[in-house]
Amino acid sequence: MVTMSKQTCIELPVNPIVLGKLGSTYGIRGWLRVFSSTEHAEDIFAYQPWFIQRAGRWQHIELEAWKHHNQDMIIKIKGIDDLDAANSLTNCEIIVDSEQLPELDTGDYYWKDLIGCQVISTAGYNLGTVNDMMETGSNDVMVVKANLKDAFGVKERLIPFLDGQVIKKVDLATKTIEVDWDPGF
């Protein structure tokens, strides 16, 4: 538990998830750019409280204000009132408890749930493990780290997350994803 003041106690996230990142400073009064990983950028503000990790320690940050500025979103964090204080927060990841995230419709998945899944081709070949996810604009892409003894000598595969076309079955209980994908790619 992190104590912020005599009146306020904030519970640390039990199931932490990164929802964004603090960017460069804006102005001299402690404002920062914020980069959101949520589907709609502004949705990041619906998930509170926010935490960051600095020097291996959790720190609660309280949002004072936010606004659009040109193509960016900028935020003011309570207690961060000058350029030096804001600079100390640049590149920190914004973390919340994943329990706050809404339930998804059938066939929709959070990236956090796909990372770590084994990817198996429809022919039964183990293509590797989902190591990361990427957004390309047209569709999400799984970054699959191949097994050490991959028969095709591949170290990493980029497999588009196209439901029905490439993705045949996702089983989060067994952490497996069945794909129609050539192991040679």
UniProtKB/Swiss-Prot annotation:
Q: Which domain of life is it from?
A: Bacteria
InterPro entries reported for this sequence:
PRC-brl_dom (IPR027275), PRC_barrel-like_sf (IPR011033), RimM (IPR011961), RimM_N (IPR002676), RimM_N_sf (IPR036976), Transl_B-barrel_sf (IPR009000)
User: What's any GO biological process attached to this entry?
Assistant: ribosomal small subunit biogenesis
Example of a GO MF term: ribosome binding
**Per the database record, which ranges form the PRC barrel domain?**
106-185
* Record GO cellular component, one term: cytoplasm
Residue ranges of coiled coil: none
Report the principal subcellular site.
cytoplasm
- Provide the protein name: Ribosome maturation factor RimM
